[in-house]
Amino acid sequence: MAGLLSTFDTFSSRRSESINKSGGGAVIPGQRSTVSVFVLGPSVTDDADKLFIATTFLAHSLDTDKQHSQRGGFLVSLLAMAYSSPELYLTTNGVNADVKYVIYNIEKDPKRTKTDGFIVKTRDMEYERTTEWLFGPMVNKSPLFQGQRDAADPDTLLQTYGYPACLGAIIVQVWIVLVKAITSSAGLRKGFFNRLEAFRQDGTVKGALVFTGETVEGIGSVMRSQQSLVSLMVETLVTMNTARSDLTTLEKNIQIVGNYIRDAGLASFMNTIKYGVETKMAALTLSNLRPDINKLRSLIDTYLSKGPRAPFICILKDPVHGEFAPGNYPALWSYAMGVAVVQNKAMQQYVTGRTYLDMEMFLLGQAVAKDAESKISSALEDELGVTDTAKERLRHHLANLSGGDGAYHKPTGGGAIEVALDNADIDLETEAHADQDARGWGGESGERWARQVSGGHFVTLHGAERLEEETNDEDVSDIERRIAMRLAERRQGILQPMEMKAAITVWITTKMTMPQQ
């Protein structure tokens, strides 16, 4: 029997391993698009020229008349300016199945009178039309930087702070846009400026070089459409984290920004490990959690097999990233969220109202986390030399802290119906309930079933299953009728009264105002 159980325990991991591993066969390359990237040649030495080219790249990346692939190419050109060898940077980090980068050099010819003396060329030939296209007149629909609105002079900044600091300010902001475009695209502007504040306070980004809101939105739209650009930036982070130690100040700032996108899209997976497994509470021994624990073990193996790219599997759209969704281990995730909302107040704002939430496990997690005995780690008792007296006093303090908080937290957000918990035991067979009329209200029970909260009115149902969400077309009397019907069904034997030990109240929020009784 032990061998049989062992086989079942390892099935999930072996199954994932067989799916993810290559089965051999011929490698057939896919179609790749060509993206032009411009790098500075050795003849461009003046810092003012370099900053001008950087702002030119930025302006082209915001030109809505160009294709997104071209705009992405200009952002790549801008990012490559941070390195003394842009070609090596692209060779190391730019290998991509979707695009092929074609590199053009920008040189400065003092004899040229047009295009500010710049010329686009390769080893074999010069590209006059491309030069005109790149350095010709442009009509910016909005300023690139907030300093342009304040009549600030970038040349003054260049003389004061130097070219590396000015270029670094621009590139760091591009990276911040990447972070917010991926993690919170709906609030891109607000998120960008909130994240930027720390870099403004430490002087990394000067006020005159702060992007305008239009610039932020323009760069964000390109990043959301160009996965190859996102992949290049992620590979840049991986290279800096693993292959080098002599990082420049700009690269260190990029690493700081990059930390915000580590494990992006994996919050549920990480929180399940943190609150569901690492707390090491006795509830993990439940048999109905065992399949999810095996699944989580398999996912951990998959995560570790990805090496330094593991924190970015969602950003890189790795085919396995969907396996990490909490719907694949709902019971364990629900239990972990129950523990989390008790142990960490910030987690009470986390969206737990998912359709796959296991309410029983969610309540169990809260109950276990509230239990003073469960809060004491027996594994550390001997290591720390904790005496029995100290443990007893600790239990006493924990009981005092949590003694007045008997309420359970309800799931928040999401598309699921919000559920609140009530500790009171309710006897459905009392005479008052038996005499309820078709409206479902009876004497004192009316106060129990409906209440006014924060100026809004909620109709509540004790011990109910999921109800259809009410709309503006449903009137209050119809809602009450539905409640009465459900209560009548339960009195007929669907739920026995003595089994109603944990009262579950489903709050159906109505958008209309309930008439006052």
Swiss-Prot record:
Task of the protein: Forms the helical nucleocapsid (NC) in a ratio of 1 N per 6 ribonucleotides, protecting the genome from nucleases. The NC has a helical structure with either 13.07 N per turn, approximately 20 nm in diameter, with a hollow central cavity approximately 5 nm in diameter. The encapsidated genomic RNA serves as template for transcription and replication; encapsidation by N is coupled to RNA synthesis. Forms the encapsidation complex with the phosphoprotein protein P. Before encapsidation, the newly synthesized free N protein, so-called N0, is chaperoned by P.
Chief site of localization: virion
Q: What is known of its domains?
A: Ncore is globular and carries regions required for self-assembly and RNA-binding. Ntail is an intrinsically disordered monomeric domain in the C-terminus.
Q: Does the keyword Iron-sulfur apply?
A: no
Supply the gene name: N
Where do the record's region annotations for Ncore lie? 1-404
Tell me one GO molecular function of this protein.
RNA binding
Homomultimerization as annotated region, ranges: 440-461
Residues that bind RNA, according to the entry?
A: K180, K190, R195, Y260, Y350, R354
- Region annotation Ntail: where it falls in the sequence: 405-517
Q: How does it assemble?
A: Homomultimer; forms the nucleocapsid. Binds to the viral genomic RNA. N0 interacts with the phosphoprotein (via N-terminus); this interaction allows P to chaperon N0 to avoid N polymerization before encapsidation. Interacts as N-RNA template with the phosphoprotein (via C-terminus); this interaction positions the polymerase on the template.
Region annotation (Interaction with the phosphoprotein) ranges: 462-471
User: Any miscellaneous information on file?
Assistant: Most abundant protein in the virion. Since the viral RNA genome consists of 15,383 bases,there are 2564 molecules per encapsidated genome.
Cellular localization per UniProt: Virion; Host cytoplasm
Q: Which family does it belong to?
A: Belongs to the paramyxoviruses nucleocapsid family.
One CC-aspect GO term: helical viral capsid
The protein's name is Nucleoprotein
Entry keyword set: Capsid protein, Helical capsid protein, Host cytoplasm, Ribonucleoprotein, RNA-binding, Viral nucleoprotein, Virion
Name the species this protein comes from. Answer: Sendai virus (strain Enders)
